[in-house]
Amino acid sequence: MRFLLSVLPVLCLTVGCNTVPDRPAETSDIHISRLFEAEQGGYAHYRVPAITVSPAGTVMVVVEARASSSGDWGLQDILMRRSFDWGETWDEPRKIVELEGVQEPNEAALAQGLTEPGVTTYNNIVPIADPSAGVVHFLVCSTYARAYYTRTEDDGETFTEPVEITDTFEKFREEYDWKVIATGPGHGIRHSNGRLIVPVWLSDGTGGHAHRPSIVSTIYSDDGGATWERGDVVVRHPELKNPSETLAVELSDGTVMLNIRNESPEHRRAVTIGPDGASGWSEIRFDEDLVEPICMGSLLRVGDALLFANPDSTEPRSPENPEGNWKRQNLSIRISEDDGETWPYKRVIEPGVSGYSDLASDGDGNIYCVYEDGTPSDRGTHVKYLSVARFKIDWIRGGRAM
């Protein structure tokens, strides 16, 4: 695998290489730009975004660009777009990952007829901004079976030669004979002590979509990405039903909170806290304030506050609708000022169809949320756009008190 230089622009989405036309902003306090549109630029869909802000202030968005509608296991590239003016304008989409040679298909997906030989799948790219080193680290997977590390020292113009780190995942085999691995998705974190921490999930690939059943853990680096180690298994199915895409954040006392996607009937996000981001995890609890529509969310620390975003599609359970409404819609952001004990304020970013999201902030007080949005379809949702919202933290505080 190699990471490409900035020499492979993808067909631009609009004349002049700005953004897809902006959707109307909710208020003058939030600016929303559409960066990708389905069936444009040579790809059928754009999914699973991640966002970070480099130490120099460049906003960087990376996405999975899917050539067909065959889901997670189809032909996928990784594209990047960057903004050098706080999200006002964006450069052209560029493919940044390419594998040399023929890629072996994932045996679990092949057994379920989800993929076929010759199909190259790049997935779950994870950025980590590292101000102390002046770099942005990246982890990425291929075929949900191999993992790589690279970094950029010039805001995404070039990347270091990638290093395969699949051996880090091999260390899980003594506890769990995985067939499927995935980093993130979304951004990882740099702890205040310098440790790089990336949540991961693994599956034996025997269940639905070859992504289930599953376990959650972390991998970490204490030497700036040069080497990576595995953490303890945090939780596994059936202790928590199919835990997967997990978010990490450093709390005010230096401990690390994980916020875990799951398929439990509680329909609430699962939370655990550990001292170092790798071990000593507390008993899993459900956060009653944070709805789980079985979808990736995002978690970010900004000063003394925590921000959490995901589709908050709550409709109360009733005799007519005993399960309530757990569709991917009504993307909302909440704020906590007590390390996630309570989430008193909420704002809606996208009231309609919405899905995966990720959060970042810059040194000028701007918060960025990249997210999937779209249109209703026979299957419930259809991701048509990838958009970026920019706002200030006071915009959230001015929202509805919960």
Predicted features by range, described:
Residues 14-16:
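C-terminal motif of bacterial Sec signal peptides marking the signal peptidase cleavage site
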Residues 7-12:
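Gram-negative bacterial Sec-dependent N-terminal signal peptides
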Residues 18-402:
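Asp-box/BNR beta-propeller blade signature and adjacent active/binding-site loops
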Residues 1-4:
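Positively charged n-region of N-terminal signal peptides that target proteins for export
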